[in-house]
Curated annotation (Swiss-Prot):
GO CC annotation: plasma membrane; proton-transporting ATP synthase complex
GO molecular function: proton-transporting ATP synthase activity, rotational mechanism
Record's bilayer topology term: Single-pass membrane protein
Family: Belongs to the ATPase B chain family.
Keyword flag Cell membrane: yes
Keyword list, A-Z: ATP synthesis, Cell inner membrane, Cell membrane, CF(0), Hydrogen ion transport, Ion transport, Membrane, Transmembrane, Transmembrane helix, Transport
Superkingdom of origin: Bacteria
InterPro entries recorded: ATP_synth_b/b'su_bac/chlpt
Record's subunit section: F-type ATPases have 2 components, F(1) - the catalytic core - and F(0) - the membrane proton channel. F(1) has five subunits: alpha(3), beta(3), gamma(1), delta(1), epsilon(1). F(0) has three main subunits: a(1), b(2) and c(10-14). The alpha and beta chains form an alternating ring which encloses part of the gamma chain. F(1) is attached to F(0) by a central stalk formed by the gamma and epsilon chains, while a peripheral stalk is formed by the delta and b chains.
Protein name per UniProt: ATP synthase subunit b
Xref: Pfam families: ATP-synt_B
Key word Metal-binding present: no
Subcellular location: Cell inner membrane
Length: 167
């Protein structure tokens, strides 16, 4: 190997050239790679944070759903109890109302029965008085003849009873 040879110097020049170009390019490439690595790390951290936030939000939502289910169950249970109580109260009110109406109807029927009975008795008495009056008027009997007839009948009854004792 000869130091004066052109290919030798060309090779050394090329190596120096590559070294000189590579050195500043190396810094630029390393800086670009470091920037990309930092960006990727930030994105990974953001993704991890988003994942943690999503998991936390999922758990919170899950707890809220459980609370809502519990609340819904309680509301349904309370509404069932309230409905049953309302039904019982209204049934009791209806029964009391019907009992009052029944008692009122019975009382009304009894009042009407009493009124009708009294009316019939009054009508019957009026009719008897009218018939007796007509009878006495048609027979044209005076008070004396009525009294005489009654006396005669009572004497007849006394005579019959004496006659029965004698026999």
């Amino acid at each position: 190997m000869n130091f004066l040879d052109e290919s030798f110097w060309l090779t050394i020049s090329f190596v120096i050239f590559v070294y000189l170009i590579y050195r500043p390019a190396k810094k630029a490439i390393l800086n670009a790679l470091d920037t990309k690595i930092s960006e990727i790390q930030e994105k990974v951290l953001k993704a991890k944070k988003l994942k943690e936030d999503a998991a936390l939000l999922f758990e919170q939502t899950k707890l809220q759903i459980q609370k809502l289910e519990t609340l819904r169950s309680q509301m349904i249970e309370e509404s069932d109890k309230a409905t049953k109580q309302i039904i019982q109260d209204k049934t009791k009110e209806m029964e009391e109302f019907l009992e009052r109406k029944k008692a009122d109807a019975i009382q009304l029927i009894q009042n009407q029965k009493s009124t009708a009975s009294k009316d019939l008795q009054d009508e019957f008495c009026d009719e008897v008085i009218t018939l007796v009056s007509k009878y006495f008027r048609s027979a044209k009997l005076s008070e004396k003849s009525i009294a005489k007839n009654l006396m005669d009948k009572s004497d007849f009854v006394h005579n019959d009873s004496k006659a029965t004792y004698l026999h």
